[in-house]
């Protein structure tokens, strides 16, 4: 039971953001010259954070009316929970600022800025650091997951956030989302082909060209490619719903138990790939599986409901994870996460409103490294 959000009510849209590498004003060779004097690396999510970024972005234009208030309450709950461990900055539309302030309370720093939706994992910058400690924010030209949703305002979020924290903005020649990238902080990434090597994002761009760009921007030495699955959900199969690094050398992978699900076969194929893989240091990966719930609370159940425990978020000293009302798998997930993250507090939240829209806690958060 790991379904994720499908195409939203508007259907296909015409993009106003950049799709092709040539449209960004850079070629791959030009970008190499532009960044050759500074080496960037994306820290792993478990490294110390300066802050977490979120977006109070649920709107009636995108979300069903009965879900909207629940999603807003869920976002506030996640933000307040994380704020007990580290600062939280939340983008909010001007017209929603009073509601957000009331729900989030003073522990969350609200910043008024135009946004379309809440998925800041995909719209926000992917933060990187240099060897000297300089902070950069990579903009991957968000295009509404391949022009499936209106995104004119969200296309600006990565640059706005980067400028706000006074970091260097790095515009990639690729179009992709943060949810498609999972790194261990030591040179290894797991990335889904179905998302990144997709003509709705990077037409005509080869895997080798993608690797060249991602290795340079994120400090990668090796990319483990998972096939993913395109066309089944709005993201075309993001990595953060399939596999996550817990530490260098250790990966937790989602395992779909429902044979009728489109994820049943692909999660098993992913397990085979991960178990056979080595990381950038030559280590064979240790792979731990997280079984999804067999049942969920029915109040907001739908075909889009994202019932996957793997979409947890690491903040300073804690793991913020979902729970779905299946006592057995909720309990087992807590135990597995506690074993994997022995030095962190495991907090499970009911985020059924967010899940009903096909996403999770990780999709709604973006870490800023310290």
At which residue positions do the language-model features occur?
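Boundary at the C-terminal end of the N-terminal hydrophobic targeting segment
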Residues: 29-34
């Amino acid at each position: 039971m790991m379904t994720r959000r499908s195409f939203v009510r508007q259907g296909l849209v015409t993009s106003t953001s950049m799709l092709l590498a040539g449209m960004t004003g850079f070629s791959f060779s030009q970008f190499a010259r532009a960044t050759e004097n500074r080496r960037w690396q994306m820290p792993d999510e478990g490294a110390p954070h300066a802050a977490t970024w979120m977006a109070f972005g649920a709107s009636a234009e995108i979300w069903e009316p009965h879900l909207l208030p629940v999603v807003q309450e869920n976002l506030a709950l996640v933000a307040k929970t994380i704020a007990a461990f580290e600062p939280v900055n939340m983008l909010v539309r001007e017209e929603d600022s009073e509601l957000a302030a009331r729900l989030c309370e003073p522990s969350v720093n609200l910043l008024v800025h135009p946004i379309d939706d809440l998925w800041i994992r995909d719209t926000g910058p992917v933060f990187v650091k240099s060897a000297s400690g300089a902070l950069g924010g990579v903009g991957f030209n968000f295009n509404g997951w391949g022009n499936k949703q209106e995104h004119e305002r969200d296309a600006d979020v990565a640059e706005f956030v980067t400028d706000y924290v006074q970091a260097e903005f790095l515009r990639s020649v690729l179009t992709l989302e943060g949810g498609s990238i999972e790194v261990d902080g030591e040179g290894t990434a797991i990335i889904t082909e179905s998302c990144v090597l997709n003509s709705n994002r990077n037409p005509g761009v080869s895997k080798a060209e993608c690797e060249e760009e991602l290795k340079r921007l994120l400090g990668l030495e090796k990319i483990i490619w998972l096939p993913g699955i395109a066309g089944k959900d709005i993201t075309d199969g993001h990595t953060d719903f399939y596999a996550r690094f817990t530490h260098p050398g250790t990966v937790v992978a989602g395992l779909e138990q429902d044979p009728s699900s489109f994820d049943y076969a692909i999660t098993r194929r992913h397990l085979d790939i991960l178990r056979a893989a080595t990381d950038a240091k030559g280590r064979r990966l240790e792979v731990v599986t997280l079984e999804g719930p067999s049942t969920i609370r029915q109040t907001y159940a739908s075909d889009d409901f994202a019932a996957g425990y793997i979409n947890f978020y690491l903040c300073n000293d804690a793991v913020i994870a979902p729970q779905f009302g299946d006592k057995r798998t909720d309990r087992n997930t807590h135990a597995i996460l506690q074993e994997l993250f022995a030095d962190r507090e495991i907090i499970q939240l009911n985020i059924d409103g967010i899940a009903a829209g096909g996403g999770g806690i990780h999709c709604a958060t973006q870490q800023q490294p310290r």
